[in-house]
Structure formats: C-alpha cells, structure tokens
UniProtKB/Swiss-Prot annotation:
Record-given protein name: Uncharacterized protein YigA
InterPro entries: DUF484, GAF-like_dom_sf
Organism listed in the record: Shigella flexneri
Highest taxon in the source lineage: Bacteria
UniProt cross-references to Pfam families, sorted A to Z: DUF484
NCBIfam families, sorted: PRK10963.1
The encoding gene: yigA
Disulfide bonds: none
C-alpha cells in the first residue's frame, strides 16, 4: 500500500508534467530561447542508455516514416490485387454475356476456371427459385434444398462462402459426377444467398482453405443470377 507521501509525490509529478506540457504548447519560442539547453537534454534509451532529445525526436520521425512506408506498400499490394480481381471478373462477365445458350455459358464458365488451374466450375440451383422442370432441359442443375441443408449447416453455418474439403456423401449432394475433388470453394448465389450454389473445384486438397480471401468468389456469386435469367425463368 502506498504511503500518503508517495501518493502526494505522484500527484505533484503528474501536475508538474501537465504544467510543463501546457507551458511548452503555449510558448513554442521556449525552444528557440533555450536551444543549447534543449540540446543538452538526455532521454533514456533501452540500448544506448541515453540519447539526446534531438536524436530521440529523429528516431521517432524515422519510425513514423517507416510505418507510413509499410502502410503505403500494403495499400499498393491491395490495389494491385484488386486490379487483378477486377480484370478477371470483367473478362468472365464479358465471356458469359457473349454465350449463345445456357450450355455455352456453363462451358465458358468451366473453361474460365480451368484457365486458372482449377479442375472446374459448377452451378446448382434450387428448384423453388428457378423453373428447372420439363419442358426445359435444365433439370440437371437442380439441387434439392432439403438435401443440401445438412451440408449448408455443417460447412457454411451462417456464412455465405466455404473453402476446404468435402467428404464423399457431401460431394454426392452437390457434385455427383465429379471425380478426384480435393477441395472446393463454394458460395451461395444471390444477394440473399437463397438461389443456389456456385462451386469451384481443385484436385489439390490444400488449394482451398478456410481463411483465404473470398472477394472474387463473392462477386461471381452476385453476378451469375442475372446472367442465368437470360436462359432460366425465376420463380
């Protein structure tokens, strides 16, 4: 427990510090009038013992510049990454828009994924949101919401995207004809995440992992429904 004298000394120190700071702020010419005294002030240093006030200030300035440089480098990296994502998305959108049929669009989508080094890309749609039944030939895209729900709860939870492996029974639900799937990037379609699922597959089990960026995946999941409406009527 601190003695009354110690508490009083701490209070006086705090008041003295505050008074000094207030005085220097109000009287900036102090440093001009007392230039030699300022140069003689020594500041504690963890390595060198003490350094001059000027050296201490310059070190702080260098550290500040270093932080600014690191932040600028990070911003540049993010800008370059975002530019790359933008052009990939723009190329995909133009390619899918130029499709002459739904099958052509799906093939272009699959080819785009292959060009990125993936095994492929697939779409599955919920029949209660799209007219997929006869007489259309789109029934192969249908995904039972009831069958998908356990997988959604297990892998996505409250999220819109999942990156990682799927087990055998799960693959049979979303990709019954797929072979040698090591990992997937899966996203719910539409702004309300209730129209279906888009999946990118890789043979590499470690290619897609939780924690990876999902910006491109998110943008594709928002873009596809409007393109699909050219060929499939919404319910």
């Amino acid at each position: 427990m601190k003695q009354p004298g110690e508490e009083l000394q701490e209070t006086l120190t705090e008041l003295d510090d505050r008074a000094v700071v207030d005085y220097l702020i109000k009287n900036p010419e102090f440093f001009i009038r007392n230039a030699r005294a300022v140069e003689a002030i020594r500041v504690p240093h963890p390595v060198r013992g003490t350094i001059s006030l000027v050296e201490w200030h310059m070190a702080r300035a260098r550290n500040h510049i270093h932080v600014l440089e690191e932040n600028m480098a990070l911003l540049m990296e993010q800008a370059i990454a975002n530019e790359g994502l933008f052009y990939r998305l723009l190329y995909l959108q133009r390619s899918l828009t130029a499709a002459s049929s739904l099958d052509d669009m799906l093939m272009r989508f699959h080819r785009w994924a292959r060009d990125l080094g993936l095994a492929g890309a697939s779409l599955r749609l919920f029949p209660d949101r799209w007219r997929l039944g006869a007489p259309s030939n789109h029934t192969h895209l249908a995904l039972s919401r009831q069958s998908f729900e356990p997988l959604r709860i297990q892998r996505l939870g409250q999220e819109q995207h999942y990156l990682g492996p799927l087990n055998g029974p799960e693959l049979l639900v979303v990709l019954p004809e797929a072979k040698a799937v090591g990992s997937v990037a899966m996203s719910m379609l539409g702004s309300d995440a209730d129209l279906g699922v888009v999946l990118f597959t890789s043979r590499d089990a470690s290619h897609y992992q939780q924690g990876q960026g999902t910006q491109l995946l998110h943008e594709i999941a928002l873009m596809l429904p409007e393109l699909l409406e050219r060929w499939i009527e919404r319910v």
